[in-house]
Amino acid sequence: MFVEALKRQNPALISAALSLWQQGKIAPDSWVIDVDQVLENGKRLIETARLYGIELYLMTKQFGRNPWLAEKLLALGYSGIVAVDYKEARVMRRAALPVAHQGHLVQISCHQVVDAVAQGTDVITVFTLDKAREVSAAAVKAGRVQSVLLKVYSDDDFLYPGQESGFVQHSLHEVVAEIKKLPGLHLAGLTHFPCLLWDEAAGKVLPTPNLHTLIQARDQLAKSGIAIEQLNAPSATSCTSLPLLAEYGVTHAEPGHALTGTIPANQQGDQPERIAMLWLSEISHHFRGDSYCYGGGYYRRGHAQHALVFTPENQKITETNLKTVDDSSIDYTLPLAGEFPVSSAVVLCFRTQIFVTRSDVVLLSGIHRGEPEIVGRYDSLGNSLGA
């Protein structure tokens, strides 16, 4: 999906990854991340958000819940980390990093609510009154007031499978009335997902029905005299979409893919955020005229299409296609069109969620001053593997 953008925006990352692979320092099935470019992307996002008065929570799941990289990004001015599930929150808190938003996309499990509240999470999203009551009890126990967001939806909204949740908009007044009765809770705002999506036909990011539901819910509360301070609208957050969010009065957004430049809008390599990540593998064997590279990093929604194959003997890079991958099977190997020498390196660049892969994550610094070095090596869940 992003091979051309990678070649255009960050050819030095390709060269650095291949060089370190030749030295035996990077193994197949590794996501190789250009730390300096991620930080530059992160800085651009912060600067753009400030221009429009939008606060940013940092999303880490796309780059493997990596605490080292998260700490560097937080130093740029992000308002804390959004943990999309309780396991991500655990990784970040073990690294002593601030989790600002928890409960969306995945609710906090019952026996972890107390800890989430006690740790000082800025806002917790709730999908049910039952969960709100758990948060209330934890807040009372901790002797603090916990801010919460309500996830809302309407019947015609778009919800990804596995993410069906929230309070239906027409019940909002009744829900808010119940929330107000619960001690230790402060209704801080509303959220939904996805609020923006890339439209291939239009060639740009457009609002979803979900964003309109979110705005209607805010207005519905305002008419009843209930003011909220946070309107959180995640999905497709980037330098070019932040102005659109500002038009709708959004106060908070949660960039993820934009940090690595792997947003659909950047397929041609023409966005402010530059590609900062690639996946490196190696030819394992041939079968019936095609080559197979080591798998483990495939993501079925990643739109991976093209690959670069590097043969050390002649220092040649050849472009080929990734053949159809059966999404119902484990990606032990991935098929590439044509035969290439065994043990040639393979580079792909596609949209990923590293935390659902089996990949290693290799952090590189110094690429653009001609001195690439590995500054960290992690698994896909943010656990250090040593330098």
Set out the residue ranges of the language-model regions.
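Glycine-rich tight-turn/loop motif centered on a GG-T
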Residues: 23-34, 118-124, 159-166, 201-208
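Aromatic/hydrophobic pocket-lining residues that form π-stacking "cages" and hydrophobic walls in ligand
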Residues: 45, 135, 214-217
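Active-site-proximal beta-alpha core segment in soluble small-molecule metabolic enzymes
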Residues: 57-198
